[in-house]
Amino acid sequence: MEIKFTIKQVVAVGIGAALFVVIGMINIPTPVPNTSIQLQYAVQALLSIIFGPIIGLLVGVIGHAIKDSLAGYGLWWTWIIASGLFGLVVGLFRKYVRVINGVFDWKDILIFNLIQLLANALVWGVLAPLGDVVIYQEAAEKVFAQGIVAGIANGVSVAIAGTLLLLAYAGTQTRAGSLKKD
């Protein structure tokens, strides 16, 4: 099976990964060590809805890997993969959010936020900490505390910033049936 990307998709991955890195450098600390409020997941969610699950996955994996490399504390693959999986899961449900058609009303906002909250709970509350325990032999209590705080913080930041980004994007799209002949 050969996967081909359009120029638009390649550019979306590049810009998305770059934004992931730059926005990810803004760290708002939490009381849990090595855990901060991250704002880049709103952009990743936007790109996942617009371009789909593979682009969302690549933005998360590439962006998080570069961010970790630049931060100087090494690559933490369980969390890098979790970032990619967040984009993948959100992108898998893109057909239920009508933003590409210029529609992002209360129903779409609700669906988007249910999807992203479940994705955040899954990847940060379960998969990333479980990976840390299995692969890195980290203390379960510590990494699950980090994961739960990260999941809540990311869920709230995507609910606010991601919703605003999708509202703005939907406003740039032409709604079906909105053009009338004079």
From Swiss-Prot:
Gene3D superfamilies: 1.10.1760.20
Subcellular location: Cell membrane
One Pfam family per UniProt: ECF-ribofla_trS
Topology within the bilayer: Multi-pass membrane protein
Keywords for the protein's UniProt record, in alphabetical order: Cell membrane, Membrane, Transmembrane, Transmembrane helix
Ranges that cross the membrane: 10-30, 46-66, 73-93, 109-129, 148-168
NCBIfam families to which the protein is assigned, alphabetical: PRK13661.1
Name of the protein in its database record: UPF0397 protein SPH_0594
Organism classification: Bacteria, Bacillati, Bacillota, Bacilli, Lactobacillales
